[in-house]
C-alpha cells in the first residue's frame, strides 16, 4: 500500500480546503448535536449515525489524499460518498426544521458537509482526463499538470525522467579494417589473431569481433537493461501505454492487462508480459495485485 505523506495534502489546495471545510462542518454538527440532545427533547437518534458516518468519511478521504490513491479506489470512494450524501441529507431534514437553535446549527453543519461531499463526488467520479480535474490538479505540487494529459492517458513524465538503466556505457567495438592501421601493436590476449608474435596475424582479421557484432553492440545494445530472472509481483494496467519508439527498453501494454513485475521500488518497473516480452513500465500506470 502507498505510504501516507502529509505533503500530498499540504501541497494540494483542493485537498487541504475540502478536508478543512469538512472538519469544520463535522465539528459544528457534532457540538450542536450534543447541545441539542441535552437541552431539547426528542433529538433524532438517527442523526448520531450521520455524525459518525461523516467522521469516517473525513478520515477515509484524508487517507486517500495523503496516499494519492484516488485514481485507484475512485469507484469505491464515490460509492461511500453517495451513501454519506443520503445520510447527511436525511440528517438535515430531521434537524433544520426544529425550533431550537442547536438543532438548526447541527442541520447547518450537515448541509455544509453535504456540499463538500457533492464536490468530492464530482471530482472522484470523473476520469483523470476530465478537464475540470486536470485544472484542479494543476494547483497541486505532487500531481500532473493539465499539460501532462494526452491521448487518453497521463504522461509518465509526471513521475520524473526514467533513471539510467546501465551502470556504464558499452565500449565502442572496432575491427582492424575500420581502424585502418591505428590499432595498437601491443599483444592483447583472449582475442582472435593468434598469440603475440604469431606470423599468422593478419590486419584484415577482426581483433574485436566481426563487423556485424561490433555494430550491433555499438548501436543496438548499449542501453539494454539486464533482464531479471524472477518476477515475484503481479500488476494490472490501469491505463494503456505506448512505448517510446526511441527507447528500446520500454514496453507497451493495454488497459487491464496483467504484467509480471520483478521490482517495485522505483518509479519505472521491470515487467514481463504474458507473451514473454520484457521491458520497463511507468509505475503510475500499474497497480499491484
From Swiss-Prot:
SUPFAM superfamilies: SH3-domain
Membrane disposition: Multi-pass membrane protein
Keyword Cell membrane: yes
Chain intervals for the UniProt region annotation (Disordered): 150-169, 185-229
Subcellular location: Cell membrane
Signal peptide: none
Domain SH3 span(s) in chain numbering: 230-289
Transmembrane spans: 14-34, 46-66, 72-92, 105-125
Biased composition (Polar residues): 199-226
Cellular component GO terms, alphabetical: plasma membrane
Extracellular side: 35-45, 93-104
UniProt main location, coarse: membrane
Chain ranges on the Cytoplasmic side, renumbered to this chain: 1-13, 67-71, 126-289
Sequence similarity: Belongs to the SHO1 family.
Its job: Plasma membrane osmosensor that activates the high osmolarity glycerol (HOG) MAPK signaling pathway in response to high osmolarity.
Official protein name in the record: High osmolarity signaling protein sho1
Source organism (scientific name): Aspergillus oryzae (strain ATCC 42149 / RIB 40) (Yellow koji mold)
